[in-house]
């Protein structure tokens, strides 16, 4: 048993206190007073964080109440033989109950879609061009020609990449900063596997960084998951899946990512 589950272990060995339920009930009853006291007395950053948390809780509560109201409200009874017949394309509008059900279905689909495309790190600090690029001066008149740039962050370069002639190469990606594999963690299985990178899908800082294959924190990459044996809904073996980088590769010397499932 893990070390942090000593309470569960003690309860299994010796049982719970006789007044456990009573103490839990009293604690729940005091919760409202505690929140009221915090709302009145907290100051500064703690007050801001508390207000933000309460705001999110109230939004969820209002949504739940609205869903219950939509479920409980009964629509107008349907007429067996309406005096004014309605064409087929307007039948849904005449039935408020089905309209509410349809509205709830659309909302739930939107929520599922939002959850599907949610990422572990929604916000990251942007990277400026001064931080990413280092100016390289080349040519006979070195003091004039400073249009070349060396990328100072880790990058991914595909196997089919061919360098342009040195004279026309604007962006230089050093070999020592190129990554081909990432340590990808599966969120549900809690296993970490080293998988080859297939490409860079999106760098949140700049579209140019995506084109150059810059690997920074929060970047969405595509990895080869064929070794994991994952299958699609149709039963075919999944080849590539997206993952988000969770560390700073330039500081750690390795690439850690979480699989988006």
From Swiss-Prot:
A motif (Nuclear localization signal) lies at residues 15-22. CDD domains: NSA2. Residues 1-36, 66-82 have a biased composition (Basic and acidic residues). Keywords: Nucleus, Ribonucleoprotein, Ribosome biogenesis, rRNA processing. One of its GO terms (cellular component) is nucleolus. Signal peptide: none annotated. InterPro entries: NSA2_fam (IPR039411), Ribosomal_Se8/biogenesis_NSA2 (IPR022309). Pfam families: Ribosomal_S8e. The keyword rRNA processing applies. The keyword Nucleus applies. Its main location: nucleus. Belongs to the eukaryotic ribosomal protein eS8 family. Ribosome biogenesis protein NSA2 subfamily. PANTHER family: RIBOSOME BIOGENESIS PROTEIN NSA2 HOMOLOG. Involved in the biogenesis of the 60S ribosomal subunit. May play a part in the quality control of pre-60S particles. Component of the pre-66S ribosomal particle. Interacts with nop7 and rrp1. Interacts with rsa4 (via WD repeats). This is Ribosome biogenesis protein nsa2. It comes from Neurospora crassa (strain ATCC 24698 / 74-OR23-1A / CBS 708.71 / DSM 1257 / FGSC 987).
């Amino acid at each position: 048993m893990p070390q942090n589950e000593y309470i569960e272990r003690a309860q299994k060995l010796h049982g719970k206190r006789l007044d456990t339920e009573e103490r839990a009930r009293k604690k729940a009853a005091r919760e409202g007073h505690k929140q009221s006291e915090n709302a009145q007395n907290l100051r500064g950053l703690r007050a801001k964080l508390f207000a933000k948390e309460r705001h999110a809780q109230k939004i969820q509560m209002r949504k739940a109440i609205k869903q219950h109201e939509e479920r409980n409200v009964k629509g107008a009874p349907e007429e067996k033989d309406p005096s004014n017949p309605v064409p087929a394309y307007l039948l849904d509008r005449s039935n408020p109950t089905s309209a509410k059900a349809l509205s709830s279905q659309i909302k739930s689909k939107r929520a599922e879609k939002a959850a599907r495309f949610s990422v572990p790190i929604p916000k990251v600090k942007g990277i400026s061009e001064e931080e990413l690029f280092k100016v390289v001066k080349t040519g006979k008149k070195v003091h004039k020609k400073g249009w070349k740039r060396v990328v100072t962050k880790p990058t991914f370069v595909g196997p089919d990449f061919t360098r342009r002639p040195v004279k026309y190469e604007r962006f230089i990606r050093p070999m020592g900063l190129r990554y081909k594999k990432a340590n990808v963690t599966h969120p549900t299985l809690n296993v970490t596997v080293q998988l080859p990178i297939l490409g860079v899908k999106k760098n949140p800082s700049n579209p140019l960084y995506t084109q150059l294959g810059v690997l920074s924190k929060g970047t969405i990459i595509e990895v080869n998951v064929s070794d994991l044996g994952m299958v699609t809904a149709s039963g075919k073996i999944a080849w590539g899946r997206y993952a988000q980088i969770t560390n700073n590769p330039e500081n750690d010397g390795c690439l850690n990512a979480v699989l988006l499932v």
